[in-house]
Structure formats: C-alpha cells, structure tokens
Swiss-Prot record:
It comes from Methanosarcina barkeri (strain Fusaro / DSM 804). The keyword Ligase does not apply. Pfam families: Proteasome. GO terms for biological process: proteasomal protein catabolic process. This is Proteasome subunit beta. It catalyses: Cleavage of peptide bonds with very broad specificity. Its EC number is 3.4.25.1. NCBIfam families: arc_protsome_B. Belongs to the peptidase T1B family. It is found in: Cytoplasm.
Amino acid sequence: MDNDKYLKGTTTVGVVCTDGIVLASEQRATMGNFIASKTAKKVYQIDDLVAMTTAGSVGDAQQLVRLVNVESQLYKMRRNESMTIKGIATLMSNFLNSNRYYPMMVQLLIGGVDKNGPGIYSLDALGGSIEETRISATGSGSPMAYGVLEDQYREDMTVKEGLDLAIRAIHNATKRDSASGENIDVVVITKEAFRRLDPEEVKSIRASLPK
C-alpha cells in the first residue's frame, strides 16, 4: 500500500522537551484541490496527559479517537491508573495491524507525559510503531517541517522553546505545501497539566517569526 496516496493534506509536528512535549497541526482539510475546512481538528486529547495528532482520512481518525478514548478510560477504571504512552501506542498499533487487509488511512503521533517522562510515538496505517525520541512530523508538509526541526532542535529545549519551534515548523510547511494552511492548533503537555493554546496566543507567536 502506498501511504503517500492517502496521507496527505496535513502537517503535524511533535517535539519532546526536557519538561514535557508539544504537539501541533495546521487546520486545513482538503478534498482534492478543494479546501473543505479551515478549522479542522487534528489534535485530540485522549487521556489526562496524552494527546494524538492525525493525518489522513478524517472518518478513520475520528473512529480511532473514539476507540482509544474508551479503552484508556476503561483501563483507568479497572487499574486505578492511566495507561502509559507506550501502552496506548501499542494498543493503537495492534488495532491498526489487525485491520491491515482493510487499512485505516491514517498516520498518528501519540505523545504525552507519564511515569517514564515525556515521549512521542509515530504510527503508520498498518500499525508500524517507531518511538521518535526527540522530533516527529507527519503528513504532506512533513518534509518542510523536518527541515526546520532538524536544523533548530536542541536536546535541552524547554517546553517554551519547543512551542516556538513547533509553530515555526508548521508555519514553514504551510508556505510550501498547498494542502496545509490556515490556523495552527497547539497542545502543550507537562507533568502538571494538559494545555491547548488560545488561537490568539498562537497568532502572536506566529507573527513574531521571521518573514
């Protein structure tokens, strides 16, 4: 299966920092050359301190979000603790692989903070899982995003610095990838809290970037 045929029209980014993680996505949804939405949601909270970004089929992505939300809540009720990020990634990987003959056309980033610290996993449509220890990007704009991430990332980055880098990477992708654009949705997760940035805060950071 050629993932590039389906995993398009999106740029999502994940950055692991010393004190948490940042997940970000632009919000354009396309149908061929038609811009179907300028406010599409692609970053979902799936547990108290875990979130997931989606690239690919909107319907498949929403089904997976519902599934992982239910499974993570059931786990918490039964064990009185949250699933680890690796546990959630493994759950999703197994589910995607079980549907490999009728694959869900998605690519996911699952990230957050658990007892083992901050982390991000990248999953393809067949459930292949790769732990990205520092930076991740998916979607049609990912080559441009990776250009920024690999050039400017530092291992000692704080969440504040990672936030600026993630927005810069998405911003750079939207300038070159016609299927990525509009607003940027950003989530910051530390061991203390899950926070989705206000659109005005994102605009302020974006406006400060070099033209």
